[in-house]
C-alpha cells in the first residue's frame, strides 16, 4: 500500500501542475533483454493531451540469455570481491554458494539461490557483503564485480566511475539506477511522437 499511496500522492501533485500522467511497471528482463529481476515503475508526464494520447510504453521483448552466460567464471577478480575464511559469515556464504550455474541473493545475511536464470535485483544495499549478488567462480565465492553490475544494468562498456568514487558508493549508485536500455526505449517512444 505504501508504494501505491506514494505514487498516488506524486500523481496528484503532477496532475495539479497541469500534466497528464502515464506510468507502467516494467521489468528489466522483459523490456531490455537483460537477465536481471528488476521491476520498477516508470512515469512519463506530458503537458500536451495530444502527445499523451499518442504515447505508448514499449512492448516486452523476449529474454534470450541467462545471467551466468554474462559471467566469466575463469576470470579472476580482485580479492576485494571474494569471501574469505576469516569470519563465520564468510565461511557460511562459501559453504552455501555451491552451484556454479546460478547467482545467489544474499540478503540480511542469508543466502538463497535464484534458479530462474536471472541476476537478482541489484540494490543500493548490495554495497555490503551481507546484501549482495553472489556466485562461485573458478577461484572461490564472490560478489558481482562493479563491471558485472554495470552490465546487468545495461550501462555501456565505456562507462567507468571516476577513481575518486569508493567501491561502496559505486555499488549504491548502481543499485539506485534504473536499467539504461529500459529508459532508452521509453525515450525513443517519446521522441517518436514529438
What function would you assign to each model-found segment?
Residues 4, 28-33:
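Short histidine/acidic/glycine/proline-rich micro-motifs that form metal-
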Residues 19-30:
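Conserved S-adenosyl-L-methionine
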Residues 1-14:
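Single conserved hydrophobic/aromatic residue that forms the stacking wall/gate
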Residues 20, 34-194:
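S-adenosyl-L-methionine-dependent DNA methyltransferase catalytic core
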Amino acid at each position: 500500500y505504501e508504494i501505491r499511496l506514494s505514487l498516488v500522492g506524486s500523481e496528484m501533485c503532477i496532475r495539479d501542475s497541469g500534466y497528464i500522467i502515464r506510468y507502467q511497471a516494467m521489468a528489466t528482463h522483459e523490456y531490455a533483454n537483460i537477465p536481471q529481476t528488476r521491476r520498477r515503475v516508470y512515469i512519463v508526464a506530458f503537458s500536451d493531451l495530444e502527445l499523451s494520447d499518442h504515447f505508448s510504453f514499449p512492448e516486452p521483448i523476449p529474454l534470450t540469455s541467462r545471467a551466468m552466460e554474462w559471467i566469466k567464471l575463469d576470470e579472476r577478480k580482485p580479492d576485494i570481491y571474494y569471501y574469505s575464511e576469516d569470519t563465520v559469515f564468510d565461511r557460511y556464504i562459501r559453504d552455501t554458494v555451491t552451484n556454479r550455474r546460478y547467482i545467489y541473493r544474499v540478503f540480511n545475511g542469508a543466502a538463497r539461490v535464484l534458479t530462474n536464470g536471472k541476476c537478482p535485483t541489484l540494490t543500493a544495499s548490495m554495497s555490503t557483503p551481507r546484501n549482495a549478488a553472489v556466485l562461485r567462480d573458478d577461484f572461490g565465492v564472490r560478489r558481482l564485480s562493479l563491471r558485472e553490475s554495470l552490465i546487468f544494468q545495461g550501462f555501456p562498456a565505456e562507462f567507468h566511475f571516476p577513481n575518486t568514487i569508493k567501491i561502496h558508493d559505486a555499488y549504491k549508485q548502481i543499485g539506485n539506477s534504473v536499467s539504461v536500455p529500459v529508459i532508452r526505449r521509453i525515450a525513443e517512444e517519446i521522441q517518436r511522437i514529438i
